[in-house]
Amino acid sequence: DSGLGKTHLLKAIAHEIGNTKNKLVVKYYTSSDFRKEIVDSLQDGFKEIESTKEKLSKIDVLLIDDIQFLANSGKTNEIFFNLFNFFIENNKQIVLTSDKFPEQLNGFDKRLVSRFSQGLNVKVETPDIITAINIVDYKAKIVNLNLSEESKKYIASFFGSDVRKIEGIINKIEFSIIQDNSAAPKIIELEDINKFLEDYSFAPGGEITVQKIKNVVAQNYGISVKSIDSRLRMANIVKARHVAMFLTGEILKKNYSEIGVAF
């Protein structure tokens, strides 16, 4: 899935390694940049491609973002396969991100997919509500916006499955304040958020209700509202149900009895 922070994690790895004293050579590529570097060197002839291979071989930690976009890349994949083997044989590290697991990747040599599968595969999960609230709080503080707790919960509940959307919301609020040529409220309340986002394409309009909370949570977790209302005990459904109940209590100020009736 997009917007979960895979690129941020790769850049954090590069930053952390760059700050250590072990003098490891770390290089971050987007898949398109990596392909372009290989294709450009291929077009410039044998000497240039050998020079590029030599440069890549001196890297200790190679980071490539969105590896799925290297599918059906022909010679680029062949060179990458040989580079991958070189890294394994020399105890170097490769970290890749993708929108799917190795066995779901199409357009790659089976040997390369096998190499991907041999490594540690970790799924980046959708942030839970507490993590999403912390992300909202962090992004707001960067631009000196002081959001009320209700405002943070509102943004996290409706947009917390995509960090890019959270950033977009914060940018929209900041821009609205600048556009109005007014000082930001000392504390930005939920009513202010609704005003700032009234023309925002992702923003749910109207009054917040239990049903709207269920709809948004169900969408974020890829399940139906009917599943939330059911007695099914599958882990993802239980988690979604608990998040919806939590938001109902926090945003709508419902007590336990009222939440029990709603769910």
Curated annotation (Swiss-Prot):
An example molecular function term from Gene Ontology annotations: ATP binding
Subcellular location as annotated: Cytoplasm
Chain positions covered by the region annotation Domain III, AAA+ region: 1-177
Gene: dnaA
Record Gene3D superfamilies: 1.10.1750.10, 1.10.8.60, P-loop containing nucleotide triphosphate hydrolases
Region Domain IV, binds dsDNA, annotated ranges: 178-263
Function: Plays an essential role in the initiation and regulation of chromosomal replication. ATP-DnaA binds to the origin of replication (oriC) to initiate formation of the DNA replication initiation complex once per cell cycle. Binds the DnaA box (a 9 base pair repeat at the origin) and separates the double-stranded (ds)DNA. Forms a right-handed helical filament on oriC DNA; dsDNA binds to the exterior of the filament while single-stranded (ss)DNA is stabiized in the filament's interior.
Protein known as: Chromosomal replication initiator protein DnaA
GO biological process, one term: DNA replication initiation
Species of provenance: Spiroplasma apis
